[in-house]
């Protein structure tokens, strides 16, 4: 469900100054419970978890959304390490895991 607060509102003066006239944009609305967004510069992809859907998704600048990982152990946090590998916090296993090797699903 798209957020119904455009422009974003806040009572925090410093945040309000930073937001300026920013507008909210819905990039994807097919996730049940989204958490853990991070920007993966090497792939120019916004990565986040669909916790309930048990998958990690990636939004590319052309608007496409790919399933990067499926059947996860309830991944709820993501990061990118110095070698540009994805690192995930897994709620189900109470573990931190890393995607050591990455093969693109599509070639530009």
Protein language model annotation of sequence segments:
Residues 1-108:
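Sequence-structural signature of mature extracellular/luminal beta-sheet repeat domains
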């Amino acid at each position: 469900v798209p957020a119904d607060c455009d422009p974003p509102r806040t009572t925090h003066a410093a945040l309000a100054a930073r937001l300026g006239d920013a507008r909210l944009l819905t990039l994807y609305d097919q996730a049940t419970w989204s958490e853990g967004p991070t920007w993966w510069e090497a792939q120019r992809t916004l990565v986040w978890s669909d916790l309930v859907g048990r998958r990690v998704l990636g939004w590319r600048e052309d608007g496409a959304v790919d399933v990067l990982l499926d059947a996860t152990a309830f991944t709820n946090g993501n990061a990118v390490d110095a070698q540009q590998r994805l690192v995930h916090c897994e709620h189900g296993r109470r573990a931190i895991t890393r995607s050591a090797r990455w093969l693109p699903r599509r070639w530009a």
